[in-house]
């Protein structure tokens, strides 16, 4: 079974959506992790509003396991601070920390699931690797589309534009990018 009951605290998994806090970033490409956590929480009918471990959190039961949903409020590049703190508190091993992040190498909405590996240039993942002390944690990478041109600044691509919106032309915004 994907979720495994083995934590004395009751929380068996951390499911972390990466993003940046605040209205300015709410529906941007970089916040697809937050959007995914919001979708899971909505489906489970629980708000992710409790501030713990420098993250908005709540617990849900998924697949028979108690899961802590997290949206770090440390900003993307410092997400590891929140993830590491919660993992240590609940004694959750890295292989039970599932991280959902954006991926600019994938088409919008396409998913890539990995057991572990490098940060691939993603600073949020890099910081989590640093704080967990390993790159061996599962992750779901959600495609947010490639930059329109190789010279296009990455921050200008993932931060100011809503999902489904191209800087040169308006198109329909995606409701969310999540696996069904």
What does each of the following model-derived ranges do?
Residues 116-117, 165:
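Short, glycine/charged-rich beta-strand-loop motifs at protein surfaces that mediate ligand recognition
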Residues 74-75, 164, 179:
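Residue-level signature for short turns and capping positions that connect secondary-structure elements
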Residues 174-180:
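Single conserved hydrophobic/aromatic residue that forms the stacking wall/gate
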Residues 155-171:
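Active-site-adjacent mobile loop/cap segments within catalytic or ligand-binding domains
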Residues 121-124:
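Hydrophobic alpha-helical segments within soluble ligand-binding/sensing domains
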Residues 71, 161, 176:
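Pocket-edge structural micro-motifs
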Residues 1-116, 126, 130, 134-141, ...:
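Nucleotide and nucleotide-moiety/phosphate-recognizing core
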